[in-house]
UniProtKB/Swiss-Prot annotation:
Keywords: Cytoplasm, Hydrolase, Metal-binding, Nucleotide-binding. InterPro entries: SurE, SurE-like_Pase/nucleotidase, SurE-like_sf. Its main location: cytoplasm. Nucleotidase that shows phosphatase activity on nucleoside 5'-monophosphates. This is 5'-nucleotidase SurE. Its EC number is 3.1.3.5.
C-alpha cells in the first residue's frame, strides 16, 4: 500500500501517551501523519462544539516523533477534526484515526465519548475513520495496541470501507502474545449507578462530582448478527473487539410500536 495521509486526534489531550504511540506507529509504517488534538483533557465531551469562544491552535511537533506535524487545539475533539479538515491541512486525509483512548469505549458509552466523536466527524465528512481505545484506564503500554490499530485500518482500506462506516476498536490491556483473536462485535448496553457527590467550595457554594460506576452490561436488543459477541464480552475474553457503527440514528424497530399521536384532532402520520 502506498503511504497514506493520516489525521489523528483524541480526547485525552496532546500530552497523552496513547496518541503519541498511535502517531508514532503510523509514521513508522511510512505514512504521513498529522495530529490535531485538544490541548488538555477532554474526555466524555461527546460531539460538542465550541461556538461562544474562539478556538486557538498551536504547533506541538516537539511532543511527537520526527516528521509528524502536530497541533494542540483549545477546542473539543470534534472542533479539532473540523479545524484540521477545513483549515489546517492542505489536503484531505486518506484515513482518520482517533485514540488511543486511555480507557474503554464500549457499548452505549460511545454516545458520550469524545474519542468516538472525533472519528465520527471524519465519517460525517465521508472519510474512512476508526476510533481506538485501550480497555483499561491504568494500562500505559500502548505499543501493541498502536500496531494493531494501524494494521486493522490499513487492512480495511485495502478491501472496502463503505460510506458512513465508523470502526470502533477496543483492545484489552495485555501484551499481544497473550491476546485473543480480533472479532467483529455488537454494541452492548451499559447501565450505570449514577451518583453525584455534593461538596462545598471555599465560599460555601455547593458543587457536584459525578461518580457513577457501571453496574451491568446488557445484551444489545438492536441490530447485529446474534452469533457476534458483544464488545464487552469480547474484551472480558481478553480479545480485541471491532464494532461497526454509523451516524444514522433512525429507529429500526417495528413502526407499529411507535406512539399513536393525535394533535388538534388530527392523527400524526
Amino acid at each position: 500500500m502506498a503511504p497514506l495521509r493520516i489525521l489523528i486526534s483524541n480526547d485525552d489531550g496532546v500530552f497523552a501517551d496513547g496518541i503519541r504511540a498511535l502517531a508514532g506507529a503510523a509514521a513508522a509504517a511510512g505514512h504521513q501523519v498529522t495530529v490535531v488534538c485538544p490541548d488538555r483533557e477532554r474526555s466524555a465531551t461527546g460531539h460538542g462544539l465550541t461556538l461562544q469562544t474562539p478556538i486557538r491552535a498551536e504547533k506541538a511537533d516537539s511532543l511527537f516523533d520526527a516528521g509528524i506535524s502536530a497541533w494542540a487545539c483549545s477546542g473539543t475533539p470534534a472542533d479539532c477534526m473540523k479545524l484540521a479538515l477545513f483549515e489546517l491541512m492542505d489536503e484531505a486525509p486518506d484515513l482518520v484515526l482517533s485514540g488511543i483512548n486511555h480507557g474503554p469505549n464500549l457499548g452505549t458509552d460511545v454516545f458520550c465519548s469524545g474519542t468516538v466523536a472525533a472519528a465520527m466527524e471524519g465519517t460525517l465528512e465521508g472519510l474512512p475513520s476508526m476510533a481506538i481505545s485501550s480497555a483499561c484506564f491504568q494500562w500505559r503500554d500502548f505499543q501493541g495496541a498502536a500496531a494493531l490499530a494501524v494494521e486493522v485500518a490499513t487492512a480495511a482500506l485495502r478491501d472496502q470501507w463503505p460510506e458512513n462506516l465508523l470502526l470502533n476498536l477496543n483492545i484489552p490491556p495485555c501484551r499481544p502474545e497473550v491476546m485473543g483473536p480480533l472479532r467483529w462485535t455488537r454494541l452492548s448496553i451499559r447501565r450505570y449507578d449514577e451518583q453525584f457527590s455534593p461538596r462545598k467550595d471555599p465560599r460555601g457554594r455547593t458543587y457536584y462530582w459525578l461518580a457513577g460506576e457501571v453496574v451491568e452490561d446488557l445484551e444489545s436488543g438492536g441490530d447485529g448478527p446474534r452469533d457476534w459477541p458483544t464488545d464487552v464480552a469480547q474484551i472480558e475474553a481478553n480479545s480485541p473487539s471491532l464494532t461497526p457503527i454509523q451516524p444514522e440514528l433512525f429507529w429500526r424497530g417495528p413502526l407499529g410500536g411507535l406512539p399513536r399521536l393525535e394533535l388538534n384532532g388530527q392523527r400524526v402520520r
